[in-house]
Amino acid sequence: IDIGGTGIKGDIVNVETGEMITERHRIPTPSSRKPDEMAEVVAQIVEHFKYKGPVGCGFPSIVKEGVCKSEGNLHKSWVGVNIDELFTKVSGQPFTVLNDADAAGYASMNYGVGKGRNGLVIMTTIGTGLGSGVFHNGILLPNFELGQIPYKKFKKIEDWAAASAKEREGLSY
């Protein structure tokens, strides 16, 4: 499951091959972006697939041992929430939650262009925010958060470089 600022998406993935087994299912992120409402959407996605078993989840903030350490593009009430426990309780399935860009980076390192690469590998995700999964010689440097770097007149670089900035400024590709 991928938690985003505008949508929460889920799919069943073959962890041996990285292939998506089902069609992606998306539900808009609740406008409050608060824990209880978002956990209910996560449970709806699990139920949509009638899935029973462990669930991996990418989350758009700093996550340490399943606990949210920053609000990212969500509500400030997320800070300090044990996301693993919340999603497990609401869905009835065991969850492992990590930073969303770190999760995308793991996918690239195991199934994509990063597979077998040494040195520095950076996965950049562009959405409501700007994420980064950074690996050195195959080892994750967790919660690197390049999008949080202060930049010029903006609070942080993702305010200038994320897809949300394109929409805010009325830009096109």
Question: What are the roles of these predicted feature ranges?
Answer:
Residues 8-12, 61, 130-135:
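Short beta-strand scaffold segments in enzyme catalytic cores
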Residues 1-2, 54-56, 121-125:
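Short glycine-aspartate micro-motif
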Residues 105-143:
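Hydrophobic, well-structured mid-protein blocks that either form specific transmembrane helices
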Residues 1-37, 139-168:
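Short glycine-rich, Thr/Ser-proximal phosphate-binding strand/loop in the N-terminal lobe
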Residues 23, 31-43, 47, 51-55, ...:
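Glycine-rich phosphate-binding loop and adjoining helix at the ATP-binding site
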Residues 97, 116, 132, 141-144, ...:
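Short, structured loop/turn "capping" segments at alpha-beta junctions
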